[in-house]
């Protein structure tokens, strides 16, 4: 089931609409954002129940996250992360490393570990190892290739926005033969000045002008949802990535559509 949880930039407005059970467009016609209505309000415009299964109008532009959304990259990232900490003599954190480190900008992760003056050395060691071997310890999630091909065939514009360094993201997509599907591949700058998801999305959107009415972000983590919301874009969260813990609290997933399988993602995207 694809569940819409009304929230973020229109939480109060859509909650009021749901409470009154309004089935017309009056309260949703002027929804702010990049020329698009929220999925919750769009469901109301189509006389659908926003708390049930929703098949939204097909988006005209879909922006995908990379790690945990298109590719299963955790093993390579974790391996290079362990290597980097070993190089500076730091202990590896316990717990599920994939859920802790895959997705957010890596230099933010190292800085948050309290490595002090060794943080830069750890980042350099990580990048050296990842760009040499870690990037290739990677695979496409099942069904991604055909999904992208079908979206393109339907006339949907496609892009990637990832907190991974942009040259590495381009290399990975080229390795899997996916580069031609994407109009824009936007990633973090190598110097780290552009790394937060909202900033990477801004970089992508600037290259995608003029933007169509219906724009959608597809990712696996909370920062994908929050980065999209910063630009007035709705989000779909895939359940096969590394961010399940991000959404344990219902409030963290507000405003997003959650899908568990490629088949559900296809329904959400109209293909």
Task: List the predicted regions and their residue ranges.
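N-terminal helical cap/lid subdomain that shapes the substrate entry/recognition surface
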Residues: 51, 56-146, 150, 154, ...
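Substrate-recognition/cap helix-loop segment adjacent to the acidic, metal-dependent catalytic center
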Residues: 86-88, 109-116, 137, 145, ...
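Structural recognition of alpha->loop->beta junctions
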Residues: 177-185, 247-269
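Short hydrophobic alpha-helical segments enriched in small aliphatic residues
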Residues: 15, 22, 27-29
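Extreme N-terminal basic, low-complexity initiation segments
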Residues: 1-18
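Non-catalytic pre-domain segments flanking phosphatase-related domains
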Residues: 26-30, 34-64
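Acidic, Mg2+-coordinating phosphoryl-transfer loop and its flanking beta/alpha structural elements
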Residues: 217-257
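Conserved Lys-Pro-Asp/Glu-containing loop-to-beta segment of HAD-superfamily phosphomonoesterases
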Residues: 61, 197-225
